[in-house]
Amino acid sequence: MASSTVSHATDRLRDAAVERRCIGDIDALVRPGPADRPPLLLLHGIGSRNFSFQPLMRALSTARTVIAWDAPGYGDSRPLASPTPVVADYAACVLVLLDALALPEVDLLGHSLGTLIAAHVAATAPARVRRLALLSPTLGYGIAPGEPLPPAVAARPAELAELGGNAFAAKRGPRLVHRPEHKVDATQAVITAMATMTLPGYAQAAHLLGSGRLLDDVALLRCPTLVAVGAEDVVTPPDIARRVAQALPPEAVTRPEAVLIEGCGHAVYLEEPAAVAALLDRHFSEEHT
């Protein structure tokens, strides 16, 4: 269970219109909306949480239900059984969540590490995903089962264990924001979420990052897919998003190139929630031709 410090941080970032729901092993935030459109499910990145999506949830159209999960091992969501999970393990949890909510189909957004999960769900369970958005995509490192994590990935959980959540977040968090000294609220939101990271959930997510192969799943996509990234992202730079957009099969292409969101770094939905919401509302309301 999360500590009281985590709970208080979460409460500060929640809206009265958003409900916290424990759905099986997953802790989620739900902003209820009309039932005549598929809900939108939001999957966060490795250093983030469901409550990080609050500004975006406020800015998105109220014409649909919006759900933001805490990934397995984050907040009050139960960690996965394997200490070295792969993307299929996380994708299975998404499908269990959809089944528990009796949702035959959703629109799906993944941010950063969440793009690995979102793309795998859409590629392997295409009937469950109507439209997809990959925001600040990460390619993953593609290590084979049993291989050691790349040093840069292995260092993450080790550093968390050594420093503790607060110091870890203070060190790593500002890099996610473009010109953090001028975006105090966004930077503090990043740090607040990152300070709640715990083991084993963060270490399991590092294994997902190490083993992920985003382009393999992107090649299998059939649903209309948006790829977008902050123009100033130094964590997953725009060239990565361009590669992802170029790898989409013709039937998944909605725009000829990745969309660049100007003036934003990696934490794009916290830096410019209104701009990101407008982009997503257009994408998820379009008819694919």
Could you tell me what each predicted segment is?
Residues M1-L40, S61-R64, L103-P104, E257, ...:
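Alpha/beta-hydrolase fold catalytic core
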Residues G24-P79:
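Conserved HGGG/HGGXW glycine-rich cap/lid loop of the alpha/beta-hydrolase fold
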Residues A119, A123-T124, V129-E162:
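Flexible "cap/lid" loop of the alpha/beta hydrolase fold
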Residues A144-L149, A161-A219:
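Conserved alpha/beta-hydrolase catalytic His-Asp/Glu region
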Residues R242, Q246-H266:
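Catalytic histidine neighborhood in serine/cysteine hydrolases
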Residues C264-P273, A277:
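Catalytic histidine-centered segment of alpha/beta-hydrolase-like enzymes
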